[in-house]
């Protein structure tokens, strides 16, 4: 054997070198396959022992006949290429010594092999031209070789060694369907079947034997033998599968056994009620052409011929993760559609690691942590119940931790344990919080410009069903969205019948609206100079006729009919009111009629115009719209018994709460009647509507304009011109014996409040006490410093600092100063807080609070201006004199020190 191997290796090596001289590089593996094909198609070639151009052309003719008979699928793609290359070598073997040596070596091997006993050849007629068996396999006992030689061809699965071969009669070759028989045999080839008791010899390419000499056999007899083997194999496989099914039925207690011809899945039935076992690899029925579905679940279990269970673990199919991820993103983690997907996945055996991988892939980081905490809590409760039951399923097994963190260990769980893991995982999923608006995705479903309305409604109903669980639950909401999210053409068709029909009526109304209809609308809108939406909204409106000519199509201002330009004026008849003259009744000025009876006052609007209705104003009737100066005698009362005179605004004003008190002009000027003074008060209706009127006193000798102090309480207030917002109450003025030596008030505005808010500026430096991480620091407020600086002496030694590459420049300079390694929390007396990273500099006389801290505190710097000074002077303030009417008030301003007994800003 060793000598044959050496000769064969020498032959292959010489052949490769010979081809290399021709500029062709080939692999030894490809040459082995080529000679295998030569042996299959030309079994006579190895037995003749001679290689010449004549015999090699006969090999080429066999290749061509095989190609014409079985087609290109049955012949290797490189067969003709290698045949041509070797043909060129044989033609030039006399000129090339290397080629001559290769041909001589091949003929020598063939002649030695041709002397082999024909009886031995009959046992090896299925062997390759170049044997690939190892030395160990050739040393096997003759009985084992006999068993191996009786196996089916290598392209079909091997049969069990324990099964006996049936010796049926050879069928008639003329009645055999060769293609159908080969397809039927190929269906039973499944690489995932469990291992058999005996395996075919290994394909050892590194220890190949010399080519075995084949005996001359009749091709017809060889085909008959192959047919009988295939039929025997099919029958045994059918019997094998039927026995497995019957065995499973007996194990589960179901006495109803299916027929042996019905090939079903051989997955093991779950042991626990309600637990659906994941389906493993499927077998193909001989009467169907469908292939098994792809196994997408991690843990599957199959049974071999001896009833032994085999478990397999596969990764998740990407389509499952993608579908679940899409449902979570569009409808939410707790939507009915999403839960249905989770429950369908949970019906299979998922290990704790599989659950964690699935949840981490489809949920956000926060939701994953929530699910994990709920899952662990459910597992703790289940583990306690298991401990009481004494079944040994602890917390580590349920969560896949500790000794069970390995996937191989989790695969061996009992089906009941898989059921507990499923319940804990799905219950944890249902406790995820609802985020966002569940109906947001539903409102986003809109009809396209060319999309049929029925397709749009179908998408809307499908999305609603996935969100609400049942589309009937939100049918009213879907109907509303079907109208609002439809395109303008469908909206125009539905609008007249919107409240008269249901969703099916909408579909019937819009059934004829398509792309051609949309195109016609676009053209009509372009010709009319309108948008499509405006065209649809206005097409059903009946435009009235012209007020002058009565014709439709234009307004009175555009009318060109001048026939009624100077119509004849009618002459009034006898006045129906006084019956004294010929005039119109609304122009009658008589106090009595023709009989001398007094006439009632005129009814109607007269010269004042129409009476103001409730929509004319938000506040009341417009009683004063003139901006001219009016005296108090022109003011009106709301009713004969009203105590106050109405004051109205002369301008359109908008007030906001941020504006504070504002003065509103009334257009009414003094003086008041003798021996009276006025009190300005707000109306009750204005206060209810959010407008606050400040009370004010009008002096008897005041001749200026009466103004109202008003403020918006909590919202924006609009005061139209002429609105009644306040009332003036006249009260008697009591004289006292005390004489006032002061000129009359005249037209001066509001008096002084005797209060002047200032911020005193002293020679002391503005300092501030702050707490950094609980330690008090006193520093100087430095608005010119960019950063906060703490002197080295005040810095705690255990607080870490880091050297920086920054240069601090001011009056002095510090190169590479040190800075706090972490952010410190600052806090003031009023519990305001923030974060800063101050610099630390040695030999600094005082701490400096820079703008990085002052900006967080929102400190503002203010200074007096000319406007404030003018306001003070207008209120009667005389520099150098006291405040007040008598100028006997305080001479120095009152500093604003703030409230010391409570936190926050303010003075009241």
UniProtKB/Swiss-Prot annotation:
Listed GO CC annotations: viral nucleocapsid
Chain span(s) of sequence motif PPXY motif: 200-203
BP GO terms, sorted: nucleotide metabolic process; proteolysis; viral translational frameshifting
Written domain comment of the UniProt record: Gag polyprotein: Late-budding domains (L domains) are short sequence motifs essential for viral particle release. They can occur individually or in close proximity within structural proteins. They interacts with sorting cellular proteins of the multivesicular body (MVB) pathway. Most of these proteins are class E vacuolar protein sorting factors belonging to ESCRT-I, ESCRT-II or ESCRT-III complexes. Phosphorylated protein pp24 and phosphorylated protein pp18 contains one L domain: a PPXY motif which binds to the WW domains of the ubiquitin ligase NEDD4.
Zinc finger (CCHC-type): 544-561
Keyword Ribonucleoprotein: no
Coiled-coil parts of chain: 215-251
Propeptide positions: 101-159
Listed PROSITE patterns: ASP_PROT_RETROV, ASP_PROTEASE, G_PATCH, ZF_CCHC
Domain Peptidase A2: 777-853
InterPro entries xref list: Aspartic_peptidase_AS, B_retro_matrix, B_retro_matrix_sf, dUTPase-like, dUTPase-like_sf, dUTPase_trimeric, G_patch_dom, Gag_p24_C
Pfam families, alphabetized: dUTPase, G-patch, Gag_p10, Gag_p24, Gag_p24_C, RVP, zf-CCHC, zf-CCHC_5
EC number: 3.6.1.23, 3.4.23.-
Membrane-crossing segments per the record: none
Protein name: Gag-Pro polyprotein
Keyword set, alphabetical order: Aspartyl protease, Capsid protein, Coiled coil, DNA-binding, Hydrolase, Lipoprotein, Magnesium, Metal-binding, Myristate, Nucleotide metabolism, Protease, Repeat, Viral matrix protein, Viral nucleoprotein, Virion, Zinc, Zinc-finger
Active-site positions on this chain: 782
Region listing for Disordered, in residue ranges: 132-152, 589-622, 884-908
PANTHER family according to UniProt: ENDOGENOUS RETROVIRUS GROUP K MEMBER 24 GAG POLYPROTEIN-RELATED, IGE-BINDING PROTEIN
Domain of life: Viruses
GO MF annotation list: aspartic-type endopeptidase activity; DNA binding; dUTP diphosphatase activity; structural constituent of virion; zinc ion binding
Entry keyword annotation includes Lipid biosynthesis: no
Annotated site, Cleavage, chain positions: 100-101, 159-160, 213-214, 297-298, 523-524, 756-757, 874-875
Catalytic activity annotation: dUTP + H2O = dUMP + diphosphate + H(+)
């Amino acid at each position: 054997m060793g000598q044959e191997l050496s000769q064969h290796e020498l032959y292959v090596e010489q052949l490769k070198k010979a081809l290399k001289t021709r500029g062709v590089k080939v692999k030894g593996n490809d040459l082995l396959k080529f000679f295998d094909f030569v042996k299959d198609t030309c079994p006579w070639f190895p037995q003749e022992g001679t290689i010449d151009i004549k015999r090699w052309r006969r090999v080429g003719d066999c290749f061509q006949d095989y190609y014409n008979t079985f087609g290109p699928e049955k012949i290797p793609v490189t067969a003709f290429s290698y045949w041509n290359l070797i043909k060129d070598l044989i033609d030039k073997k006399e000129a090339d010594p290397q080629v001559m040596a290769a041909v001589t070596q091949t003929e020598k091997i063939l002649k030695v092999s041709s002397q082999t006993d024909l009886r031995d050849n009959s046992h090896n007629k299925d062997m390759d031209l170049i044997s690939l068996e190892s030395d160990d396999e050739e040393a096997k006992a003759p009985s084992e070789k006999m068993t191996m030689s009786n196996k089916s061809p290598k392209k079909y699965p091997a049969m069990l060694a324990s099964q006996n071969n049936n010796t049926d009669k050879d069928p008639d070759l003329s009645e055999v369907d060769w293609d159908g028989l080969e397809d039927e045999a190929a269906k039973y080839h499944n690489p995932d079947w469990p291992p058999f008791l005996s395996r075919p010899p290994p394909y050892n390419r590194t220890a190949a034997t010399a080519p075995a000499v084949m005996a001359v056999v009749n091709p017809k007899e060889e085909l008959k033998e192959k047919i009988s083997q295939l039929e025997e194999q099919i029958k045994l496989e059918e019997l094998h599968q039927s026995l497995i099914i019957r065995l499973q039925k007996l194990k589960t207690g179901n006495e109803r056994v299916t027929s042996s011809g019905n090939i079903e899945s051989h997955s093991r039935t779950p042991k626990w009620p309600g637990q659906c076992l994941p389906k493993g690899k499927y077998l193909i029925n001989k009467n169907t052409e469908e292939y098994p579905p792809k196994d997408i679940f991690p843990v599957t279990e199959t049974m071999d011929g001896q009833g032994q269970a085999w478990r397999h673990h596969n990764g998740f199919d990407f389509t499952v993760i993608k579908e679940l991820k899409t449902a979570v993103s569009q409808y939410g983690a707790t939507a009915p559609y999403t839960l249905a997907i989770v429950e369908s996945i949970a019906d299979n055996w998922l290990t704790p690691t599989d659950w964690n991988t699935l949840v981490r892939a489809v949920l956000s980081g926060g939701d994953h942590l929530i699910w994990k905490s709920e899952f662990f809590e459910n597992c703790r409760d289940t583990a306690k119940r298991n401990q009481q039951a004494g079944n040994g399923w602890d917390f580590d097994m349920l969560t896949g931790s500790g000794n069970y963190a390995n996937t191989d260990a989790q695969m061996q769980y009992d089906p009941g344990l898989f059921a507990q893991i499923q319940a804990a995982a799905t219950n944890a999923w249902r406790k995820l919080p609802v985020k966002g608006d569940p109906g947001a995705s539903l409102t986003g479903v809109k009809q396209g410009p060319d999309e049929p309305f029925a397709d749009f409604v179908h998408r809307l109903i499908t999305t609603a069903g996935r969100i609400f669980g049942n589309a009937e639950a939100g049918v009213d909401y879907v109907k509303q969205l079907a109208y609002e999210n439809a395109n303008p053409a469908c909206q125009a068709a539905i609008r007249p019948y919107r409240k008269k029909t249901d969703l099916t009526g909408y579909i019937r109304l819009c059934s004829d609206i398509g792309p051609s209809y949309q195109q016609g609308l676009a053209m009509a809108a372009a010709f009319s100079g309108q948008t499509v939406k405006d065209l649809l909204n206005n097409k059903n409106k009946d435009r009235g006729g012209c007020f002058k000519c009565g014709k439709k199509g234009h307004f009175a201002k555009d009318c060109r009919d001048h026939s009624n330009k100077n119509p004849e004026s009618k002459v009034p008849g006898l006045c129906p009111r006084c019956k004294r003259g010929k005039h119109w009744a609304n122009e009658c000025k008589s106090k009595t009629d023709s009989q001398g009876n007094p006439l009632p006052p005129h009814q109607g609007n007269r010269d004042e115009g129409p009476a103001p209705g409730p929509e004319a104003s938000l506040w009341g009737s417009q009683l004063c719209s003139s901006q001219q100066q009016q005296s108090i005698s022109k003011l009106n009362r709301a009713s004969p018994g009203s105590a106050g005179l109405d004051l109205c605004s002369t301008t359109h004003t908008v007030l906001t709460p941020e504006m504070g008190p504002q003065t509103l002009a009334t257009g009414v000027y003094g003086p008041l009647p003798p021996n009276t003074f006025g009190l300005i008060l707000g109306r009750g209706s204005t206060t209810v509507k959010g407008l606050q009127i400040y009370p004010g006193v009008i002096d008897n000798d005041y001749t200026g304009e009466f103004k109202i102090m008003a403020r918006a309480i909590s919202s924006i207030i609009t005061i139209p011109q002429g609105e009644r917002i306040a009332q003036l109450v006249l009260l008697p003025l009591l004289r006292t014996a005390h004489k006032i030596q002061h000129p009359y008030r005249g037209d001066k505005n509001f008096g002084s409040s005797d209060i002047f808010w200032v911020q005193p500026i002293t020679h002391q430096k503005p300092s501030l006490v702050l707490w950094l991480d609980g330690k008090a620091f006193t520093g100087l407020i430095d608005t010119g410093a960019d950063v906060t600086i703490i002197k080295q002496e005040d810095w705690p030694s255990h607080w870490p600092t880091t050297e920086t590459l920054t240069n601090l420049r001011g009056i002095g300079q510090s190169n590479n100063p040190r800075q706090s390694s972490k952010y410190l929390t600052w806090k003031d007396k009023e519990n305001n807080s923030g974060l800063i990273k101050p610099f630390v500099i040695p030999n600094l006389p005082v701490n400096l609070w820079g703008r990085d801290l002052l900006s967080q505190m929102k400190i503002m710097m203010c200074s007096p201006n000319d406007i404030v000074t003018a306001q003070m002077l207008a209120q009667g303030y005389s520099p150098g004199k006291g405040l007040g009417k008598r100028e006997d008030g305080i001479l120095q301003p009152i500093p604003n020190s703030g409230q010391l007994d409570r936190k926050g800003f303010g003075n009241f």
